[in-house]
């Protein structure tokens, strides 16, 4: 889902776009296939910083004169000879084709990119836009630290925009070549792969990365206390490694093995590999450093002291309760409600005051900043904070006094309008830990029936509040949340409700059953108040501390990609117009589609709508790129001018920074002090900027690890228990494969044509055709028939299905199963074609 929904607690984006056309993977695993060209000439050395700065300062000819631009480098996982660099002013990612032009750049590097003249750009081909698209924003800074305009003699940005319009008008794909690596990718230090004997060079050891976007490497000899490596690796041994060097004359880079993870055929080894390749094994070790633990209060039962309570508003008499999943132990948010007078309500959001325990500049603060986020895997959590803080001292446990940061509103019951607001540090005592199911029970009670909590919903034993009162609070809060939600969507919020895979696990965390997590009105109740608190806090800190506030922005999606979704829905002939011109129009289009199309189809369109979306990012309002352009502060999906993260400090470090900022700008009355606008100290600004950058990287790594954990567990579950399910076609790779989306589990899976015994395929005009092998070819005369190889996964397709023509959003029925990949060394989710309507 885009961050119009899960931003309040733990939203996550999904997947990459796949389009019709394109080919399969090129060059096998890794990228060690030589430099191309008749002479196989190696690429030139990278330009030195002085040369880059000189080109930027002296490039009077602008881009045409050779001035490079700064860009991130991404590799196509299905064809590693294709690299892509997003440049905001250009309508499509810049294609960097072939090892020589990629010039030893690694997926995730920030590079200096030389753009070819537009006269050399090729025409776009069907499916040729497979590169990762980066977020739009300010012009990329030049290599000398100047702006693009300055680096290109005043004409760089204008020239880029002119080139971009030229490419868009003529349907061209920009191309370029890497001339230097400016910032090495973090993935260089956390590679994971199979240890193999190379075919050349005396059979030297080589690393075959699990991530096909990374290059195959030559393994350096063991050094010092490094791990012992087997003389004859089995081919299933998984190791971690770091890329040490890649010289221009070398076909393969050098890597040094840093650890041995084990046999890839074991599920636990695959799980560890996921963490290693995201760098989370380094940032989230099982144990916290001793100096960080020494910052905690002495062990034993903790009660707030008089010093702890000084300056806090005492809200312990208030009726406060939390609503969470039944498995939650880190309770960092709670709600309160009180009816002040007819039509006047008081609603409170109370957040664990983590910043009280995590002092700025302490060893614990450094460790929390390094981890930056909790990582949620199937059956396991890698916490940001020590468990004593997560689950005890900070967790808003019922019946216990807890330190909090509260936001309290007086609300008009009829309209949901906020009449008054207070923010500040507090002390609360929750009266109950409720589950979403408990709140949902109350919400679903008939309006005329007295509110009551269901069985199993217990309050703290010494709570002075009644079950009836808490149930009435839930009912009233639901009414306010409903008004807030309706207004938010009326003002343009967008929610991409992609189904979320979840598991029922045994007491040891092993998955027993997979299903889609169902979000209901109780979830939305909590979500609305968390969104409101985040929004209001963002407005306060952005106004009172404009130089150092940590906010969260979300750039608009790639317009060309959303236009493709519009065209796709139009071709389906569904009623109504599908419009993506704004977040509000997008939301209304999805709502109409959900009302008129089958669930699986509307869900697949929502998935395809997610793919053009960019990730939301933390940023500092004083950063050069943002300070002068507040339009960039906006959150597209939520349609908020200001937004931040305040409500989950137990598991997100930026929330801790926001708490500290808010505490610094509030007066004793809970209102912001008069704005002071001195420029922040350069050192302070640099620290906050670095924290935002690291938090963005860690959030993405945690999301990737969570997705990897979900898919890994599902693949092993399906290996023993395949599932027959409805599916929708969402992508294809020529006549080699097609991808399907399964709404029942919220997953994509690939169907390989080569598995279909006696079936041949053709691809033409955006359609994939399947016919019996004996049928006459329907595309080009004389095209050879596909040879059927020995295939343990081969199966016969029901002849009554053939011939079959598939397009995007074609409905099917498939069998999901766990397929061994990498020569039987790993398991992944795959699908077989069963039937079509």
Q: Where do the PLM segments sit?
A:
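Electropositive polyanion-binding surfaces
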Residues: 225, 235, 245-249, 263, ...
């Amino acid at each position: 889902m885009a961050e119009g929904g899960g931003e309040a607690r733990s939203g996550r984006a999904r997947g990459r776009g796949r389009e019709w056309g394109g080919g399969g993977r090129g060059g096998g695993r890794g990228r060690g296939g030589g430099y191309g060209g008749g002479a196989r000439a190696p690429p030139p050395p990278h330009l030195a910083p002085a040369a880059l700065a000189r080109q930027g300062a002296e490039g009077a000819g602008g881009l045409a004169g050779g001035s490079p631009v700064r860009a991130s480098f991404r590799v196509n996982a299905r064809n590693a000879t294709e690299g892509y660099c997003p440049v905001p002013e250009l309508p499509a990612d810049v294609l960097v084709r072939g090892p020589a032009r990629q010039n030893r750049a690694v997926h995730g590097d920030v590079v200096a990119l030389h753009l070819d003249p537009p006269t050399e750009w090729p025409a776009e081909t069907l499916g040729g836009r497979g590169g990762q698209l980066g977020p739009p924003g300010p012009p990329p800074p030049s290599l000398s630290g100047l702006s693009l305009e300055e680096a290109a003699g005043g004409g760089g940005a204008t020239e880029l925009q002119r080139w971009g319009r030229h490419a868009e008008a003529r349907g061209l794909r920009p191309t370029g070549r890497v001339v230097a690596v400016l910032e090495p990718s973090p993935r260089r230090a956390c590679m994971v792969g199979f240890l193999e004997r190379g075919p050349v060079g005396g059979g030297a050891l080589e690393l075959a990365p699990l991530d096909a976007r990374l290059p195959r490497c030559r393994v350096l000899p063991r050094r010092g206390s490094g791990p012992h490596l087997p003389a004859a690796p089995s081919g299933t041994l998984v190791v971690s490694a770091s890329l040490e060097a890649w010289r221009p004359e070398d076909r393969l880079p050098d890597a040094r093995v840093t650890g041995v993870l084990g046999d890839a055929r074991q599920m636990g080894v695959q799980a560890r590999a996921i963490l290693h390749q995201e760098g989370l094994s380094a940032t989230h070790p099982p144990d916290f450093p001793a100096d960080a633990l020494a910052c905690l209060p002495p062990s034993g039962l903790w009660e707030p002291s008089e010093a702890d309570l000084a300056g806090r508003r005492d809200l312990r008499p208030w009726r406060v309760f939390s609503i969470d999943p039944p498995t939650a132990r880190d309770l960092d948010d709670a709600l309160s409600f009180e009816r002040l007078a007819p039509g006047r309500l008081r609603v409170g959001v109370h957040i664990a005051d983590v910043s009280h325990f995590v002092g700025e500049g302490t060893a614990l603060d450094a460790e929390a900043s390094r981890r930056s986020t909790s990582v949620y895997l199937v059956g396991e959590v890698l916490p940001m904070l020590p468990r004593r803080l997560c689950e005890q001292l900070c967790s808003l446990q019922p019946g216990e006094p807890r330190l909090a940061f509260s936001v309290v509103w007086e609300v008009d019951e009829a309209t949901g309008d906020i009449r008054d607001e207070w923010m500040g540090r507090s002390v609360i005592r929750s009266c109950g830990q409720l589950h979403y199911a408990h709140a949902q029970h109350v919400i679903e009670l008939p309006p005329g029936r007295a509110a009551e909590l269901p069985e199993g919903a217990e309050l703290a034993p010494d709570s002075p509040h009644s079950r009836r009162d808490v149930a009435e609070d839930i009912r009233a809060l639901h009414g306010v949340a409903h008004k807030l939600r309706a207004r938010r969507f009326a003002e343009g919020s967008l929610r991409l409700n992609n189904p979320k895979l979840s598991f029922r696990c045994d007491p040891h965390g092993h998955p027993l059953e997979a299903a889609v997590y169902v979000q209901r009105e109780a979830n939305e109740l909590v979500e609305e108040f968390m969104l409101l608190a985040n929004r209001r806090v963002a407005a306060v800190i952005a106004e009172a501390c404009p130089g150092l506030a940590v906010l969260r922005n979300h750039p608009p999606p790639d317009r060309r990609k959303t236009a493709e979704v519009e065209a796709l829905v139009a071709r389906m002939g569904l009623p109504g117009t599908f419009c993506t011109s704004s977040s509000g129009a997008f939301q209304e289009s999805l709502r109409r589609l959900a009302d008129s199309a089958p669930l699986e189809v509307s869900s697949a369109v929502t998935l395809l709508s997610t793919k053009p979306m960019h990730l939301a990012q933390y940023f500092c309002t004083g950063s050069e790129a943002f300070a002068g352009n507040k339009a960039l502060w906006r959150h597209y999906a939520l349609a908020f001018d200001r937004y931040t993260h305040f409500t989950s400090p137990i598991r997100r470090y930026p929330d801790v920074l926001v708490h500290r900022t808010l505490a610094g700008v509030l007066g004793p009355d809970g209102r912001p002090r008069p704005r002071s606008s001195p420029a922040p100290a350069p050192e302070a600004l640099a620290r906050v900027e670095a924290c935002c950058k690291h938090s963005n990287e860690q959030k993405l790594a945690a999301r990737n690890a969570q997705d990897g954990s979900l898919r890994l567990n599902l693949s092993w579950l399906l290996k023993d228990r395949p599932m027959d399910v409805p599916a929708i076609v969402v992508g294809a790779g020529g006549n080699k494969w097609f991808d399907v989306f399964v709404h029942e589990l919220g997953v994509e899976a690939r169907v390989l044509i080569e598995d279909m015994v006696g079936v041949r395929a053709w691809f033409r005009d955006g359609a994939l055709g399947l016919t019996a092998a004996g049928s006459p070819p329907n595309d080009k005369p004389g095209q050879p028939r596909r040879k059927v190889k020995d295939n343990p996964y081969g199966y016969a397709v029901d002849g009554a299905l053939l011939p079959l023509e598939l397009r995007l959003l074609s409905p099917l029925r498939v069998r999901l199963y766990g397929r061994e990949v990498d020569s039987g060394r790993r398991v992944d989710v795959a699908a077989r074609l069963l039937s079509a309507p």
